[in-house]
Structures are given as structure tokens and as C-alpha cells.
């Protein structure tokens, strides 16, 4: 909604028009207003008692459209853009004690779409407190292994699979 209501924050195509897709508008991860707004919102959530924020869509659009970024010399990659925003959020929020996590795309990991999404699993797990992924019982082990490829990442406590169906074993509370 932000990109649609405040055009100055919108991610742009190479021609300078606002990028939109079936998800709606996307914000430019380098836009100063967007960054300031996200940090302010997170700080307010911390003051309200929240101890963690999980960003959804901390990624770039999956379309192959060429994108243009605000205030950048050169042409950063989509990964550069996502990592730069994650670093900014981590640095700006570290003093608050708020955990910074993200919901990443299983497609980015399993179908190797990270170059389009910008969600590089060799970098993001180092910047985030937790990595959350919508998973199935069939792919959860593969996702865990891919995200925890770096031995410094503790998958037991920092990998959070969101499962639509509870596994056969264990105790779970389910709805529906």
C-alpha cells in the first residue's frame, strides 16, 4: 500500500514508472523515507512490548523486469538491494533489543530464484535473528539444510518453518 499511496517510495522500472504486479506496488529498498518509516514503526512496536518483527516480502519482485533504485550510483543487484535494507534495519534496530527476522520465499531457495528475489541465503541468515519459510513436510528438511549451509547458523533455534499441516509425530495445536 505504501508504494501505491506515496509514489515517491515506489520501486521503479528502468523507464521510471512505478513497478506493480499482482501483489500491488513495491517500495524501493534504498528510499530514505521507506527506511525511516520502517525503523520508526519497529521502534514503536518495541515500545508497545513486541520483542520481534518478522518482515514479509523482504525481497524484490520475481519478474525479470529491470529495476531502478533511488539515490544509487551504479546499478546494484537485487541481492544488493535486499541485503542493504536488511543491514540498515539490523543496524538501526540493534540498540532496541528488537529481534529482526524475515519470512523468505521457499521458491527463492528451492527453485534458485534468489537472483530475482534478492534473498541470498549465504548472507541473510547472518543479518537476521530468525529465518521463517512457508514449508511443507516434504521440503522442510531441504529448506533447513539450504538455510543452515553456514555452520554458524543455528537452525534448531533460528529456522522457523511455517507448516500448513502438522507433521504426523509430535504434539501440535491446529485449527480448522
What is the predicted function of each stretch?
Residues 1, 54-55, 76-117, 153-167:
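Aromatic-lined carbohydrate-recognition surfaces of secreted/lumenal glycan-active proteins
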Residues 1-43:
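Active-site-adjacent "subsite" loops/lids of carbohydrate-active enzymes
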Residues 21-37, 106-114, 169-175:
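Active-site mouth loops of central-metabolism enzymes
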Residues 26-57, 120-124:
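An active-site-proximal structural segment forming one wall of the substrate-binding cleft
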Residues 42-43, 82-90, 121, 125, ...:
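Generic structural signal for well-ordered alpha-helices
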Residues 51-80:
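Active-site-proximal loop/short-helix segments
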Residues 101-137, 173:
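Substrate-binding cleft/loops of secretory-pathway carbohydrate-active enzymes
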Residues 128-176:
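Substrate-binding cleft of secreted/luminal carbohydrate-active enzymes
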Amino acid at each position: 500500500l505504501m508504494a501505491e499511496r506515496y509514489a515517491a517510495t515506489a520501486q521503479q522500472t528502468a523507464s521510471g514508472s512505478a513497478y506493480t504486479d499482482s501483489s500491488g506496488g513495491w517500495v524501493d529498498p534504498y528510499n530514505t523515507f521507506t527506511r525511516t518509516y520502517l525503523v520508526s514503526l519497529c521502534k514503536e512496536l518495541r515500545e508497545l512490548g513486541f520483542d520481534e518483527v518478522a518482515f514479509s516480502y523482504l525481497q524484490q519482485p520475481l519478474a525479470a523486469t529491470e529495476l531502478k533504485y533511488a539515490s544509487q550510483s551504479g546499478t546494484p543487484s537485487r541481492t544488493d538491494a535486499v541485503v542493504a535494507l536488511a543491514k540498515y534495519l539490523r543496524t538501526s534496530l540493534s540498540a532496541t533489543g528488537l529481534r529482526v527476522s524475515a519470512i523468505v520465499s521457499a521458491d527463492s531457495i528451492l527453485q534458485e530464484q534468489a537472483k530475482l528475489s534478492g534473498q541470498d541465503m549465504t548472507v541473510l541468515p547472518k543479518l537476521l535473528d530468525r529465518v521463517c519459510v512457508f514449508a511443507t513436510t516434504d521440503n522442510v528438511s531441504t529448506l533447513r539444510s539450504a538455510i543452515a549451509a553456514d555452520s554458524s547458523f543455528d537452525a534448531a533455534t533460528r529456522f522457523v518453518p511455517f507448516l500448513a499441516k502438522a507433521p504426523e509425530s509430535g504434539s501440535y495445536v491446529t485449527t480448522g
